[in-house]
Amino acid sequence: MKQAVYVASPDSQQIHVWQLDSAGELTLLQTVDVPGQVQPMAISPNQRHLYVGVRPDFGIVSYHIADDGTLTAAGMAPLPGSPTHIDTDRQGRFLFSASYSFNCVSISPIDTHGVVQAPIQQLDDLPAPHSANIDPTNQILLVPCLKEDKVRLFDLSAEGQLTPHAQADITVAAGAGPRHMAFHPNHQVAYCVNELNSSVDVYQISNNGQEYHLVQSLDAMPADFTGTRWAADIHITPNGRYLYISDRTANLLGIFTVSKDGRVISLVGHHLTEAQPRGFNIDHSGNFLIASGQKSDHIEVYRIDQNTGELTTLKRYPVGKGPMWVSIRGAQNS
């Protein structure tokens, strides 16, 4: 099984395309020069398109993904603000872009060729939205707003319009700073990493996906850590057994075990990683984690122990300057 790994390096305006084999080895396939500082990336649900957000000319570049994982540019569309995080709906019809600095979220249609078009809606006055996350039902968009310590909830219509959800916004602990989210594969639990206190909140999803209730909040840092907390990313293994977060001050990956129903997580350890791990991801087999070092200009591959979730370092690889994002496309026909 061979997968494709995409690493976005904004300071050199590049995407490095790698092939990941079943042993965890990476082979460089392509280096793509991007028209701007590339940061957030998202892969279409059918795994045939890669979308990347760029600045300072704010926009989304659409790429077609070949069978071997290499990229061909297919189009570019404008955005109303600097893209911080992007996601697509689960049918590949719409792309959502959260702009932290411009306090907005925009919705862009995706045409039948998989190319993102100009936005059709813009939601303003959102205090520092750090991500836009479509829920497992494809009906609700969750937007963590870091500066107001809330996760905003919006209903998504069939036409790609967002309206406030019936449930009140989720309020997190004061000063926590909600940032990125992940969903358990059972679709019944959501996780949110909080940037400013490096904690993880666990939410039970009920009423056919319509309600979110906090069931646990857990510190992700070592007990003796006294530095500034600065969490970044969060991902869960495809089997739902292990959850990971990154902290950029400590240069750590936090390792959690997850209960069978997803509602209880337990911190079991930490693994030192690349300098300032802004982004990481887990491959589709659940065997490997790949982390990027924004200050090291390298990525590092780890093997995930299937019995404990602990990480074993395999190899590090040079990439572009200031790598911030890692996306992984599954093996074709797998």
Curated annotation (Swiss-Prot):
Catalytic activity, reaction form: 6-phospho-D-glucono-1,5-lactone + H2O = 6-phospho-D-gluconate + H(+)
Superkingdom as given in the UniProt entry: Bacteria
Gene3D superfamilies xref list: YVTN repeat-like/Quinoprotein amine dehydrogenase
Gene Ontology MF annotations: 6-phosphogluconolactonase activity
InterPro entries found in the cross-reference section: 6-phosphogluconolactonase_YbhE (IPR022528), Cycloisomerase_2 (IPR050282), Lactonase_7-beta_prop (IPR019405), N2O_reductase_N (IPR011045), WD40/YVTN_repeat-like_dom_sf (IPR015943)
EC number: 3.1.1.31
Coiled-coil segments: none
GO CC, one annotated term: cytosol
Metabolic or biological pathway, per its Swiss-Prot or TrEMBL entry: Carbohydrate degradation; pentose phosphate pathway; D-ribulose 5-phosphate from D-glucose 6-phosphate (oxidative stage): step 2/3
Pfam family, one: Lactonase
Keywords: Carbohydrate metabolism, Glucose metabolism, Hydrolase
GO BP term, pick one: pentose-phosphate shunt, oxidative branch
Function: Catalyzes the hydrolysis of 6-phosphogluconolactone to 6-phosphogluconate.
Similarity-based family: Belongs to the cycloisomerase 2 family.
Name assigned to this protein: 6-phosphogluconolactonase
Organism: Yersinia pseudotuberculosis serotype O:3 (strain YPIII)
Name of the coding gene: pgl
